[in-house]
Amino acid sequence: MITVYRNSVQSWEIDQMGHMNVQFYFEKALQGCVVLWNKLGINDQPIELGNMYLSLSRAHIRFLKEQKPGAPFFLKMGIVELGDNEIKIYLEMIETITQLPCAAFNFQFVWIKKPSSEVKESFSKIFEELKVDIPSYGQPRGLSLEKEPLMSLSQASQKNMIDSFEAVILLRQCDNMKKIKPSSYMGIVSDSTPHLLAYTGTIDENGMTNVGSAALEYKFDFFEYVPLGTHLKTKSGVQSLSAKTFVWKHWIFNVETAKPVALASAVAVTMDLQARKSIPIPPEMAEALTKLIL
């Protein structure tokens, strides 16, 4: 694998749980991918966090260790699979001090523009150099990668789901083509969290209680990258529940078309925010989550 990114955690990247927010992990990994696009010569018309040839269709992320302000880290990348229709990329975020991985990313890109023979040749050459197998800590653990049937906004409204986000897409959430960035979809899901915490009783009018939650694993399917100004709504429910963890399902819809634009699944663990460790789900929280099981 090659190093494609090096930086440190910024204070403004910290969320209400006291650690780097998931959307910034995602954004940094996408920046690392741009290094590969540059190497391959497919970034002659740069798109922020993307390129003209490939579109991110699926992402799977494992969060292995929380990151605090000022923590230095770097990203390494390899290529898992090179096919006619898609490319699978693996990245690791590694702590500079411990040299241990703190996050693992699996990205699946699909071709949206037919590559030239030169681009194909470049990919074949670099694939031989960067071919990598996904280690056990980077593979799915609490989530299935099977495709799920789609549903409309009206179908979602008939289920045990809560409205967790609604807004129009702003310019700062878009790339230079004025289309929403993949990491902005992650941001939308993250921004919905306080509504979910309020429903489960772990946040009140005074802010956070001493109980919160942290994401251990995410899966994202991207169906459409909508343009600036698009009206989006997120419906959220619970897929499963155990003693310490639960799985959220977040469907993001285009309100105008009623079609899903992205689907996120997240394994979350209940967390004592003072001790910074996982705890069993409190009975009141478990009762609230049970009502949202799909």
Give each language-model segment a name.
Residues M1-R58, Q108-E217, D272-L294:
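Hot-dog-fold acyl-thioester-processing enzymes
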Residues T3-Y5, R62-P72, K76-S152, V226-L228, ...:
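HotDog/MaoC-like acyl-thioester-processing domains
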Residues L56-L64, F74-K76, L216-F223, T234-K235:
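Short structured motifs
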